[in-house]
Design a protein with these regions (language model features):
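N-terminal beta-strand motif that seeds the catalytic metal site of vicinal oxygen chelate
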Residues: 1-18, 67-70, 119-146, 158, ...
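Exposed loop/turn and edge beta-strand positions of beta-sandwich/beta-sheet ligand-binding modules
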Residues: 3, 66, 100, 131, ...
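Vicinal oxygen chelate
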Residues: 12-15, 65-66, 70-113, 139-143, ...
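Active-site beta-strand termini and strand-to-loop segments that position acidic
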Residues: 41-47, 106-109, 172-176, 240-243, ...
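Ordered, small/hydrophobic-rich secondary-structure cores
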Residues: 7, 28-96, 100
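Core segments of cupin and vicinal oxygen chelate
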Residues: 1-2, 8-54, 136-179
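Short acidic/glycine-enriched loop/turn segments that link adjacent beta-strands
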Residues: 35-39, 98-102, 164-169, 190, ...
Length: 257
């Protein structure tokens, strides 16, 4: 079964970012015995592999602090067969063979980086909260992008939301565990991957951890707080910004899958 098993952020301080996600969301270090790299710092909720990837002076793609890419567990052959049925040519590029988890990569029709791995990302099946269960992608054409992920990765459409006042349109897809929102005319200005979403047992508990955890910020950096949106949003009501400024949604009920 094709499944989302990986997300990655680009950061200028991977130690600080992994410390934050460990203290606040209970993510643990995932040791990759094959990849000798100080840039890649893998952590996990037990199911999904999350890479806090340090930006290096020389990288194969333009780099900035952001939520950078998504990874699917699927074979090259299956992925290539599905890509061949798409209405434009998309070619797989082999990832560097340096011990990293993914085998191949490509850009989706709107330029978002997607990685694939036949053997997965070194994680198991875990259902204990908190769990990283959602991301949102800015879409120029949410219908077409949804068709792509349905075709190539067998994702199912589970929900739609249209907001007439802002002409925001969102399609929510699922692989059975992980949710992806494709949002056209998004209220978040960031292009590409716009946010991460954690299914949590209690938002109050996350708030308590933010207050009482050991330090994960530096002097004069603003305190991280849980914020709230109005109901006319394609995203969850509660969210925060991680130490790099990335948006992280919080939900006690989770996302429809």
């Amino acid at each position: 079964m094709v499944s989302v098993r990986h997300m990655a952020n680009l950061t200028k301080n991977n130690r600080r970012l992994t410390r934050f996600y460990g203290l606040i969301f209970g993510m643990d270090e995932l040791w990759n015995e094959w990849q000798n790299s100080s840039a890649a710092f893998y952590i996990t909720d037990g199911y999904l592999n999350f890479n806090c990837l340090e930006i290096l002076p020389v990288m194969s793609r333009p780099a900035s602090v952001r939520i950078d890419h998504i990874g699917f567990m699927v074979s090259k052959q299956e992925c290539e067969t599905k890509l061949a049925a798409w209405d434009q040519a998309i070619k797989l590029e082999q990832s560097p063979q340096d011990g990293r988890y993914e085998d191949w990569r490509f850009d989706d029709p709107e330029g978002n980086l997607v990685e694939i791995a036949a053997r997965g990302w070194g994680t198991e099946s875990n259902t204990k909260l908190p769990l990283l269960r959602h991301t949102a992608i800015h879409a120029q054409d949410h219908e077409r992008l949804a068709d792509f992920y349905k075709l190539v990765f067998d994702m199912k459409e589970v929900y739609r939301k249209d907001i007439a006042e802002t002409n925001t349109k969102a399609i929510y897809l699922s692989d059975g565990n992980f949710s992806i929102a494709l949002v056209q005319n998004s209220p978040i200005e960031t292009k590409g991957f716009q946010l991460l979403g954690f299914h949590v047992q209690s938002i109050a508990e996350i708030e308590e951890r933010l207050r009482k955890s050991p330090p994960f910020l530096y002097p004069r950096e603003p305190r991280i707080e849980i914020l709230r949106r109005t109901s006319d949003s394609p995203f969850k009501e509660h969210y925060l910004r991680d130490p790099d400024g990335n948006v992280v949604d919080l939900s006690e009920e989770g996302w429809e899958v």
